[in-house]
């Protein structure tokens, strides 16, 4: 018979839903166990010890009772490792943060530890919390880095990127590589030279370099479409779009925050 153990680990909250009168079911991405669901009993009571630690994007230290035969574990304790207060102050940072945790929730397998992916998510949320500009650059960067961790690294070659000398080139959805306009890659998608070069930076450069990258709104939209189409091709229906549609409704109802 499988024995119950007590697990203490760092975690990022991916999502939570109300359960019953006072509880919540919370999906965590943990450093030690990967993605898993926990029951937080009494989390919705006014004086709950969980406080705000179960909100999506929270970076926490959790203690839970783990039994391998269960699909839902029992959460005992949760406290902030780092409180990302500024992340929730502006729509652009909320947008990117929610997209990141939704993507992780969609692509991670249950109880499959992915320490590199966990470190990536924490690093991205930390940067969102402190960034003053170009926070949207994090979104294509995180997607392409996560694809690499999961075994579908974009085959971006510097020589081929530099060979794109005209106004347009090609992105291969099959391997994520950039090719000149006269190339013959599998599953080609035509794009502007500016977007392909920005895509290559997001795929190969370090985070500090990516955060210094300046893109026009048109190029940014094109880069995001390239990354989205590449991941959709690689992960099929697992690639999520729920937060995108919700955020579009929010942006349509509020003045645009230009500090992106």
Swiss-Prot record:
InterPro entries listed in its UniProt record: ARFGAP/RecO (IPR037278), DNA_rep/recomb_RecO_N (IPR022572), NA-bd_OB-fold (IPR012340), RecO (IPR003717), RecO_C (IPR042242)
Source superkingdom: Bacteria
Function: Involved in DNA repair and RecF pathway recombination.
GO CC terms: bacterial nucleoid
Protein keywords: DNA damage, DNA recombination, DNA repair
Pfam families: RecO_C, RecO_N
Keyword DNA damage attributed: yes
Protein name per UniProt: DNA repair protein RecO
GO BP of this protein: DNA recombination; double-strand break repair
Family label: Belongs to the RecO family.
Signal peptide residues on this chain, from the entry's feature table: none
Keyword Lipid metabolism on entry: no
């Amino acid at each position: 018979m499988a024995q119950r153990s007590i697990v203490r680990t760092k975690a990022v909250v991916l999502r939570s839903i109300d359960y019953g009168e006072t509880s919540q079911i919370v999906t965590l991405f943990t450093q030690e166990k990967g993605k898993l669901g926990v029951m937080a009993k009494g989390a919705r009571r006014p004086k709950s010890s969980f406080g705000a630690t179960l909100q999506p994007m929270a970076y926490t230290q959790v203690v839970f009772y783990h039994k391998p035969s269960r699909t839902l574990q029992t959460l005992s304790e949760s406290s902030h490792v780092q409180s990302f207060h500024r992340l929730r102050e502006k729509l652009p940072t909320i947008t990117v943060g929610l997209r990141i945790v939704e993507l992780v929730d969609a692509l991670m397998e249950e109880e499959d530890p992915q320490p590199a992916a966990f470190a990536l998510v924490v690093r991205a949320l930390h940067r969102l919390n402190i960034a003053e500009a170009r926070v949207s650059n994090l979104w294509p960067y995180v997607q392409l880095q996560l694809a690499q961790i999961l075994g579908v690294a974009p085959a971006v070659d510097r020589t081929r990127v530099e060979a794109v000398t005209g106004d347009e080139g090609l992105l291969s959805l099959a391997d994520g590589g950039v090719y000149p306009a006269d190339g013959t890659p599998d599953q080609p998608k035509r794009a502007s030279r500016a977007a392909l070069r920005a895509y290559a930076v997001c795929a190969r450069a370090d985070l500090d370099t990516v955060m210094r990258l300046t893109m026009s709104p048109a190029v940014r939209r094109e880069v995001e479409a390239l990354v989205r189409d590449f991941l959709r091709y690689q992960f099929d229906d697992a690639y999520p779009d729920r937060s995108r549609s919700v955020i579009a409704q929010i942006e349509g109802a509020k003045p645009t925050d230009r500090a992106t």
